[in-house]
UniProtKB/Swiss-Prot annotation:
Keyword Transcription assigned: yes
Family matches, as CDD domains: WHTH_GntR
Originating organism: Mycobacterium bovis (strain ATCC BAA-935 / AF2122/97)
Domain HTH gntR-type: 17-85
Transmembrane segments: none
Lineage: Bacteria, Bacillati, Actinomycetota, Actinomycetes, Mycobacteriales
Keywords tagged on the record: DNA-binding, Transcription, Transcription regulation
DNA bind region: 45-64
Signal peptide residues on this chain, from the entry's feature table: none
Domain of life: Bacteria
Protein name: Uncharacterized HTH-type transcriptional regulator Mb0505
Pfam families, per database record: FCD, GntR
Record-level Gene Ontology MF annotations: DNA binding; DNA-binding transcription factor activity
């Protein structure tokens, strides 16, 4: 068994709400901090439950989440063995990396998002149907009617789901959703990017115009421009809340 590093004060009792998720987050943070390096074994359930101030049933549910994320592997006779987080792509692991590594890693994640932009725009302009055009206009209207930053943020996410659906590329949809899900519960830290409605609406209207005109080049450029601009606003919002 590989002995983990100092563990005595790493844990704080999780909030009572959604205890299993809080347990998973606490242990995941310890893993990412190197308290439990790859190949090491987590402490016995009784010890972990005592340190976290939770019962063993809740602890097992939290450990099950970690196993689902791929951060640990349960081996009979050996306990919960830590896997290498750098080899994992589960959105919850990526979200944990954003939480631990901060703005620099968020920038890297948003670079992936922006890189998908030209393909999204090009395919949407080439493949969208009249039904897609109607759905895009309806989604844009929801963004226009949003009267708070949080509502605008939610409407923007919904707009892009409609836009990506119009590409008729399921793999692209899965990739974009992976990036979106990687933000996990951190969306609130990015809401400030939607405080000013004008740049959001201006760019989304340009995307709509290019897609509905069936202009792949213009659509590719407008989607990429919007994702790059919104990424800058998101990083600023994230840093302002740090």
């Amino acid at each position: 068994m590989v002995e983990p590093m100092n563990q005595s004060s790493v844990f704080q009792p999780p909030d009572r709400q959604r205890v299993d998720e809080r347990i998973a987050t606490t242990i995941a943070d310890a893993i990412l901090d190197g308290v439990f390096p790859p190949g090491s074994t987590l402490p016995p359930e009784r010890d972990l439950a005592e340190r976290l101030g939770v019962n063993r049933t809740s602890l097992r549910q939290g450990l099950a989440r970690l196993q689902q994320m791929g951060l640990i592997e349960v081996r009979h006779g050996s306990g919960s063995v830590v896997r290498d987080p750098e080899g994992l792509t589960h959105p919850a692991v990526v979200e944990a990396l954003v939480r631990k590594l901060g703005p620099d890693f968020l920038v890297e994640l948003l670079e992936i998002r922006a890189a998908l932009g030209p393909l999204i725009g090009r395919l949407a302009a080439a493949r969208s149907t009249p039904e897609d055009a109607e759905a895009l206009c309806a989604a844009l209207e929801v963004v226009q009617q949003a009267d708070t930053a949080a509502a605008r943020q939610a409407a923007d996410l919904a707009y892009f789901r409609v836009l990506i659906h119009s590409t008729r590329n399921r793999a692209l949809g899965l990739l974009y959703r992976w990036v979106e899900h990687a933000f996990g519960g951190r969306e609130h830290a990015l809401t400030g990017a939607y405080d000013d409605a004008d740049p959001v609406l201006t760019d989304l209207r340009a995307i709509n115009g290019a897609v509905l005109a069936g202009d792949p080049a213009a659509a590719a450029a407008t989607v990429e421009a919007y994702l790059n601009a919104s990424a800058l606003r998101m990083v600023k919002s994230y840093r302002d809340r740090a």
